[in-house]
């Protein structure tokens, strides 16, 4: 006898194909993950390919499982949720062989929860996620590739949910549907609030749309018809096509988008948010179109001073235009460039959000103050002409600003290694700096990187703006006058690439000096 362990309706559908492919006998276990009615429905569907089943929905399951399997020899354990502690309390590697199967989009989207932090302990006897992956003797998959397991371990199985009696409607009717999904950490209250806000905005943008809630995660939405179904979407799609000739499917990066995109009569679209830039990039490779969905609606003016940066300014501008946040104006202040900087910048003026001003050379502080005088928004963001923002930069930081009305300034982390910025946003709730600790450290180090900072215009004006006498560390000098014990935050999350242009040796030396100055006293920099 073999055990197959499932935690979602999708896993049940894949497990059914595994049972067909192996032709072996199974004892099915379904772990209830929410109060959605489909949890019990799909647990019952396991009876169709398992000799016996157990639905885990209370703390009494241990004794029931021992009783049901008392005289049964378990040979193999089939698992999709690789890090599930309940599963690992049952699986015993001493006498069970482990096989695995797909757990949704983690098979094709990386990084994911199975490719990150593989050294974490996920079960008894200090078994780590990495060991679980290595223990798998074969991974059953409905996809052509896999992000977790090597090609040698992949066992391809079919996946077809179309009913035998299916007939597509020919009535010309069209319907829009949205597939719900939790973004970020589904047990984090802050992330659930972000998911609810983004989902609500997506539904409002779509207008007349049917909402299909996720079977494992509850997301509260308002003023929309939530469809009550007893099927997961991979099966429900055929019921829709029986009533509508064409179905427009929208979502974030749900597995369902991959699995229904090639069905005749179905068109698939996804929303790019600050949390899903990497996932959406992968979806594009599969031919799935995307549209940006900003979390914040706050207006922000971006000030970019530039001087002789014809080789880097285009990338800096492109990184601004590629933000998931869209309500911005980019104010480029050209400080009298003598190279082709102006020509490069003017190519972007067809975008009405881009403004270009060329002034006589007067230094970076003067250029910044000119930019501030042109700004009309409540918030001002700083961008350097040789740095690049990641797509999530504005949305992520503006959301943090709006959550705390005491903040006048916020910044984040940068890196000179672009590889560390790949794979989407990697948020950290640890080692953020704020309050008196940040205020104290600013007396000894410039804690903010200029190209990550967003501040209130009113606070900068009150502090007197940038002082032209301190070009080279004009930012630090401003923070010293502006930051108090409760109005600033430095978030320990990478949002920008810190450029060091090789073609300008003097500029390279200068920027390196500034980077090193992060650990010096102000007096040392003044020397």
Sequence positions of predicted segments:
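Active-site and donor-binding regions of nucleotide-sugar-utilizing enzymes
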Residues: 4-123, 256-258
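Donor nucleotide-activated moiety binding/catalytic core segment of transferases
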Residues: 59-65, 215-263, 283
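Conserved catalytic-core segment of nucleotide-activated headgroup transferases in glycan assembly
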Residues: 172-213, 217
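Nucleotide-sugar donor-binding/catalytic module of glycosyltransferases
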Residues: 295-516
